[in-house]
């Protein structure tokens, strides 16, 4: 299945403790169906000190399920993503506006 959300997309959180917040996707794991969004779903992780890194409580962005994310269109609204053929190329488009996301 083609990826509806990709790295670098601006998304809004639809459900969970960060509902309504927007951010940019920093990584996507298609196998588990999760994505890491910058500044969203932050958890405090305790890390052990090493020779190069200082230990302590470090905030870390945790993965969010892709079903809880929606692409943000040009109007700043959450939209679903569809696919269409443009010439001989398959492109993503925003269902609310019909604008092509990636040419």
UniProtKB/Swiss-Prot annotation:
Q: Got a GO cellular component term for this one?
A: ribosome
Molecular function terms, GO-annotated: rRNA binding; structural constituent of ribosome
Q: Which Pfam families match?
A: KOW, ribosomal_L24
Q: Which domain of life is it from?
A: Bacteria
**Gene3D superfamilies xref list:** 2.30.30.30
Keywords attached to this entry: Ribonucleoprotein, Ribosomal protein, RNA-binding, rRNA-binding
Q: Which family does it belong to?
A: Belongs to the universal ribosomal protein uL24 family.
Q: Which HAMAP family match?
A: Ribosomal_uL24_B
Q: What does this protein do?
A: One of two assembly initiator proteins, it binds directly to the 5'-end of the 23S rRNA, where it nucleates assembly of the 50S subunit. One of the proteins that surrounds the polypeptide exit tunnel on the outside of the subunit.
- How is the quaternary structure described? Part of the 50S ribosomal subunit.
Recorded protein name is: Large ribosomal subunit protein uL24
Gene symbol here is rplX
